[in-house]
């Protein structure tokens, strides 16, 4: 009698099933990673404007614009944020948006970033806000799911 070599059909099917389960777990983790990285990116893009807003407030130039005694925080365009440039003299690239802020700037200015359709579908339309307090400190809050937020940003369902 010859000795058999190789795998049986059932053994091969079990291996394929195990690989399928592992691949589905890895895909879910990757999708969560993509969303978290997009939220962190917008957190940083919006956060960059805090220094410019502080400078404007300290200089007493609270009206947004390019003229004398006006302030332009120079929000950069992002392909995962929606929102038109608030300075009519500045044109941003197509399919990009900028962080929104009030005009005039106040001691409690909010820098608001809204995720557009280029962001992961689970965060479309969600907001991330850097809120200034009268004391001069800033805090972050968002209505994106808490599991996607960095540790310094709090979930806020009211946004």
UniProtKB/Swiss-Prot annotation:
Which stretches are tagged as propeptide in the UniProt entry? Answer: 1-6
The portions of this protein that span the membrane are 7-29
Q: Indicate where the modification N-methylphenylalanine is found in the sequence.
A: 7
Q: Membrane topology per the record?
A: Single-pass membrane protein
- State its location(s): Fimbrium; Membrane
Disulfide bridge partners, by residue number: 56-71, 140-153
- Transmembrane helix recorded as keyword: yes
Which SUPFAM superfamilies does the record associate with it? Pili subunits
Pfam families given in the database record: N_methyl, Pilin
Any keyword Glycosyltransferase? no
* A GO CC term assigned to this protein in UniProt: membrane
Q: Which UniProt keywords apply?
A: Disulfide bond, Fimbrium, Membrane, Methylation, Transmembrane, Transmembrane helix
Q: Name one GO biological process term.
A: type IV pilus-dependent motility
The annotated subunit structure for this chain is: The pili are polar flexible filaments of about 5.4 nanometers diameter and 2.5 micrometers average length; they consist of only a single polypeptide chain arranged in a helical configuration of five subunits per turn in the assembled pilus.
Family as reported in the entry's similarity comment:
Belongs to the N-Me-Phe pilin family.
Q: What is this protein called?
A: Probable minor fimbrial protein
Q: Which organism is it from?
A: Dichelobacter nodosus
